[in-house]
């Protein structure tokens, strides 16, 4: 069983939450969103805990992996926090709108040896 924390409980976050709980090998442990109402809705649907900060969600000792489905401007911060905590991470696209910030993020985490995946669902569309 993989215990997952979800950062972001908006439209895409809800979709990820449903996918997580429909997989018998996964368990949604905690949810964080700046909008507490959204976090509570998703957490209640999934029997998960609402965390008060992204740091609490990522550093929760039960959590083995992190899904990032928050606003784009938070992605780099959350990727770095997750990588430094040693948690494999799936982050929704885009990483950021500024390529220099993306490169800085890469340089900060590249030697941490933590899997980070970006969710590009239409990589090969024409």
Can you say where each PLM-predicted feature lies in the sequence?
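N-terminal Rossmann-like dinucleotide-binding module
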Residues: 1-46
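Short loop or secondary-structure boundary microenvironments that flank
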Residues: 10, 32, 72, 95, ...
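Short alpha-helical
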Residues: 11, 37-38, 73-74, 97, ...
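Beta-loop-alpha module in the N-terminal Rossmann-like domain of NAD(P)-dependent dehydrogenases
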Residues: 16, 48-108
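Acidic-histidine catalytic/liganding microenvironments
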Residues: 23-24, 60-61, 125
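Short, well-ordered coil/turn segments that N-cap beta-strands
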Residues: 26, 87, 114-115
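General small-molecule cofactor/ligand-binding pocket signal
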Residues: 29, 51, 117
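A contiguous active-site-proximal alpha/beta segment in oxidoreductase catalytic domains
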Residues: 96-126
């Amino acid at each position: 069983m993989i215990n997952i924390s979800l950062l972001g409980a908006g439209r895409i976050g809800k979709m990820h939450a449903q996918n997580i709980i429909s997989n018998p090998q996964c368990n949604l442990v905690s949810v964080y969103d700046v909008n507490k109402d959204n976090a509570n809705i998703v957490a209640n649907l999934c029997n998960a805990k609402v965390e008060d900060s992204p740091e609490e969600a990522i550093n929760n000792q039960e959590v083995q992996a992190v899904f990032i489905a928050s606003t784009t401007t938070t992605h780099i911060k959350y990727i770095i926090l997750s990588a430094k905590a040693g948690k494999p991470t799936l982050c929704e696209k885009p990483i950021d709108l500024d390529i220099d910030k993306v490169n800085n993020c890469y340089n900060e985490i590249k030697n941490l040896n933590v899997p980070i995946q970006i969710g590009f669902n239409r990589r090969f569309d024409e």
